[in-house]
Amino acid sequence: MRHIIELKDGWQFTNLDGQTSEVSIPHTWNAIDGQDGGDDYKRGTCTYTLALQKPEFDPDTQEVWIEFDGVNASAQVSLNGQDVCSHDGGYSTFRANLTGLLADENELVVKADNSKNDRVYPQMADFTFYGGIYRMVRLLVVNKAHFALDYLGSSGIRVTATPEGAGAKVRVQSRVTTGDVTVTVIDRKGRVAGTGTGLDTTIEMAKARRWHGVEDPYLYTARCEVTVDGSVTDRLEIPFGVRSFRVDEKHGFILNDEPYDLHGVSRHQDRKGIGNAITREMHDEDMALIREIGATTLRLAHYQHDQYFYDLCDRNGLIVWAEIPYISKHMPNGRANTISQMEELIEQNYNHASIVCWGVSNEITIATKDKQDMLDNHRLLNDMIHQTDPTRFTTLACYAMCGPFNKVAHITDVVSWNLYLGWYVPGLFLNDLWIGFWHLCYPKRLLGYSEYGAEGMPNLHSDHPRRNDHTEEYQAVYHEYMLRCFRRHPWMWANHVWNMFDFAADARDQGGEPGMNHKGLVTFDRKTKKDSFYLYKAWWSSDRFVHICSKRFVDRCGKKTTIKVYSTDDTVTLMVNGKTVGKKTSSDHVFTFTVPLDGDLDVEAFSGLKKDTAHFHKVDKPNPAYKLVKNKNAQKSNWVDN
């Protein structure tokens, strides 16, 4: 059976300046300089060296493999001076067989390279390309008869579950080095639901509970075993869900033959002071916050995420858009890399019930218009996806300035747009016009919003919020409009807020904090939920609550002030300094009260048994700390212009 050894500690890291220090994996060398602005974080080749003791194994019957979950962006691996493997693409798993190269004492060297080049994606994007071995490294000691470890970093097993009536057919395809395969399907209670044998076996289940999104994310397990002469030599357990899905021009996304509203967020994986070298506990925290607002879908941008997080999506019922970092700028020398990254994305994630579509590219027309090579690359990827995985549909995210008639917008099965009308472009009403115009031109071609949002700083506030002021209040006003807008267009297939969390983009200088994109509903450190977070929770979640907005906007001036409240309920009562000042109803979860500002205010908002409180202080003049002070010497705030 498999024996797994994590190679976490004792690595010697040599940076670009030739300085060496001891580090633990996961690790990135850009955790600080990739988040502080200036577009000057260190990019190049750094070296990780590990004194590796040969694990116990029988070379006559066993093999030793090394597995990397993620090295950004290119990796060169050697053992005792001999080349082992190389890999281009910083977000996917890759492995190599070390069996014939191991001595008793070994020197393992990994060169990680995030240098600028013209062949490995991404090279131009609004996020930091952290260099390093930022996901786990392991040794795998396996019997020679095992599930394939050399096929595109995958498990070597594909599970395809097709609903049929009240039951299902479960096809399990296996790649093995040698031996026979036995498959046992087990339900959540550990009961056997079906068995099969062979490299390509189909198991019929008379009854099969559906995986139905956040309402019922029911998972089965395919226990797959390699046997030789009746003895089990390798075993993997693959969770899978039984579900059907499609898109419909009238009702959007359909799950298990029922309309299923896809409203959710996008996610970048990085953290403050940590970069992309995050832990499972951090993944868990992200998922808990996403579930709290009631999201039903998640766009995992702009690259392959950690396998553990896809597992969390399966278990929590989120519908996932998965994509490769073919982004912003088409590179003629990068075609092979787009293909290899897409192949790895599909093979490594094929069994995840949560994933319904593969994203081909993001905003590719920022730097490349509808040129033939770019279009050919997209058609090649689109065709390859359909051939490799006919069970899912394709999509892409178009750049805001990519018009509805651009050819690239009509290659994939469905399309989405990254649109910031009301943020980068004045006029929130333009969203309704744009959506309506698209639907008029292409009534049978499904549209979604893959990105929409506005920057919001929890320390910036205004009585009269306006576009580009970066206040928490304008971000909330923006999202209030967008939620009402999408309600007016129920045929859209999916909409994703950009972003669930603030994230690092070292080329940016906006909001008074260089190196950051502040469009998140939650701050970079995950410690502060902005008002917009509670707005979405009010619209999407069934958890009853009341939230008073602008609590951080403490100092207020004038004769009157506005108190805004979000709640899942349709009625809210407001008390100020112990007296009831109003009771309001709302169909959009937003309740606005205007109250006299005669002095300090102790405010309480009630809905049923739920309550929230806030304190506001009367001042003579606006607090200057609440207003963004723009740095005249700062670089251009729009990263595209840099």
Model-derived features: positions:
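Substrate-binding/catalytic cleft of secreted carbohydrate-active enzymes
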Residues: 171-173, 287-290, 297-539, 543-562, ...
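Secreted/periplasmic carbohydrate-active enzymes, especially glycoside hydrolases
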Residues: 1-302, 310-312, 316-320, 341-344, ...
